[in-house]
Amino acid sequence: MAGKRENFVRVDDLDSRLPSSSVAFQQNYASNFSGQLHPIHASNETSRSFKKGIQKGSKGLKSIGRSLGFGVYRAVFPEDLKVSEKKIFDPQDKFLLYCNKLFVASCILSVFVDPFFFYLPVINAESKCLGIDRKLAITASTLRTFIDVFYLAHMALQLRTAYIAPSSRVFGRGELVIDPAQIAKRYLQRWFIIDFLSVLPLPQIVVWRFLQSSNGSDVLATKQALLFIVLVQYIPRFLRVLPLTSELKRTAGVFAETAWAGAAYYLLLYMLASHIVGAFWYLLALERNDACWQEACIDAGNCSTDFLYCGNQNMDGYAVWNRAKESVLKSKCRADLDDNNPPFDFGIYTQALSSGIVSSQNFIVKYCYCLWWGLQNLSTLGQGLETSTYPMEIIFSISLAISGLILFALLIGNMQTYLQSLTIRLEEMRVKRRDSEQWMHHRMLPQDLRERVRRYDQYKWLETRGVDEEYLVQNLPKDLRRDIKRHLCLALVRRVPLFKSMDDKLLDAICMRLKPCLFTESTYLVREGDPVDEMLFIIRGRLESVTTDGGRSGFFNRSLLKEGEFCGEELLTWALDPKSGVNLPSSTRTVKALTEVEAFALTSEELKFVASQFRRLHSRQVQHTFRFYSHQWRTWAACFIQAAWRRYCKRKKMEEAEAEAAAVSSSTAGPSYSIGAAFLATKFAANALRTIHRNRNTKIRDLVKLQKPPEPDFTAD
């Protein structure tokens, strides 16, 4: 039999050293079998050949897959990605979220840096020629190159970022595709072209070519190339920023962590648009000035248009033009705001030419002036612009008005949304307070009740700021709720002496079931004789506890409750009693708040559950602690001590009276007839003392009538 058993071989008992591809082959093609494991009669040689066949077959399938170009499609859950050997990033990983935020910032910086290339052309006021600011060209090219490095890093990161398989989005987050080939294919089909066009260093190439050639004829070509290239590259850059921001919101849940950050973000975008508009206005002003100079040069006859660009002073005929250029250009291309009939209508660019910023070498002054012009006209939708009949100028003005309208609406709408989120709770409180006032007025509540309602609403607002803490905590997982409750309540619960010596498991169960309560001044928490439905543990404030022993005449007991004490101890006795029914115990005291009180409440159902689940509450130590801090037990103990003390005083006085009577009788010893008189005097004195203390004895008996509180069923140590 043993030999026959050795001939049985299971498929799943094959060598565990098989590669993962063969295991995947077995799993993928398991449906080809009948679904049940049958014994296979084979020898050891047959089993070894079977192993080799599976290995070769799986390798063959993999090679066929590579030759067909399909790749190996693999998907894992996010938690499995952490133990993967491949460096593939989870799209919701904190590091990747930080990199995406950094990339958004780099995109915004690139959009901010690119308009600096529009400030490169500048007019030389002395030579009356158009040149390029070399220092600014080097600075702008360096900044653009540095920012493009972030683009390249982001492109490399996209090739290592997993994505969620569309077919696995039925439930939960879905499975992550970690196959590098699939990730690269998806990126190449979606965003690679846009990223590639955005990162091309075309402005740097144009600037570096000009800096190396330094020919005057290259100024015009450089100016036109920069205008065209920056405009063209703005399209893919904007197309990349907006989806990336949306993806960041979808992945992280929010784009800005605080409302002020969100408002500042949209304000920054509005200022960025003003910066772009100002740079365009500066460059287009130079274009109009260049067009005027070319017309004046052609009309002069002794001028070549190459003379208008710096670096061409060595050309033939420049000396003749140099003598006449001042008068020709000033008469033909004069820009004056006060001139109602100018020789050349510069339109909206007159302000730039008359202010002299196109010829200023101070970049800070030039930039601030253009930024202010862009911000002013975006905010006013270009209402103060007086355009000429030049088509490009009119198109620029129309674009400015439309862009200003859209951006201003976005700015106001988003800033209002973000800033309203700061005061939404306050507004809700105002609405609730208004509704409460209208309701109290409609129901004609007395003034004292209205004041109590207002005081409670105000105190609750100051404590919670309108946030429903219980609702927030209830939506969290159980272990997270336990940790939060432990963090919030454990230190306060340990201040209650009844819970100070309990173990952590019992304290966690109590903290999970505690509910915060607020009571304003002069609020009655419970009245004597009412059912006790919750046990309160005081955290802050002062309370007054009064009892009349069920309304008995002549009996009044008053005590103060402070931080760390509790009330409603009748409920604990009821919860610990296994024979207690569904009827709640009656309160033996009236508890009133003397100040604003914060407390934790433990309801009857929750206390009964804790008492039934945790035997620690039945220990002798808890019994002694409960008796020591219970005001009901303290009242009983005080009455018991008073009754014992009065009995002691009575007995002592009677003994003193008898001693005095005996002394009198011994001092008056004489004839025999005086013995009977002394006996009668002693008897009369005893009767007198007995009569004097009769009323006092009645009071003592009434005091002792206060019943001892029922003891709970402490069945375990």
From Swiss-Prot:
SUPFAM superfamilies: cAMP-binding domain-like, Voltage-gated potassium channels. It is found in: Cell membrane. Homotetramer or heterotetramer. One of its GO terms (molecular function) is cAMP binding. The chain crosses the membrane at residues 103-123, 137-157, 191-211, 225-245, 266-286, 392-412. Residues 614-629 are annotated as: Calmodulin-binding. Residues 124-136, 212-224, 287-391 are extracellular. Probable cyclic nucleotide-gated ion channel. The lineage of its organism: Eukaryota, Viridiplantae, Streptophyta, Embryophyta, Tracheophyta. Belongs to the cyclic nucleotide-gated cation channel (TC 1.A.1.5) family. Residues 1-102, 158-190, 246-265, 413-717 are cytoplasmic. The binding of calmodulin to the C-terminus might interfere with cyclic nucleotide binding and thus channel activation. It is a multi-pass membrane protein. A nucleoside 3',5'-cyclic phosphate binds at residues 498-628. GO terms for cellular component: plasma membrane; root hair. This is Probable cyclic nucleotide-gated ion channel 5. InterPro entries: cNMP-bd_dom, cNMP-bd_dom_sf, Ion_trans_dom, RmlC-like_jellyroll. The gene is CNGC5. It comes from Arabidopsis thaliana. Keywords: Calmodulin-binding, cAMP, cAMP-binding, Cell membrane, cGMP, cGMP-binding, Ion channel, Ion transport, Ligand-gated ion channel, Membrane, Nucleotide-binding, Transmembrane, Transmembrane helix, Transport. Residues 634-663 form the IQ domain. It holds the Pfam family cNMP_binding.
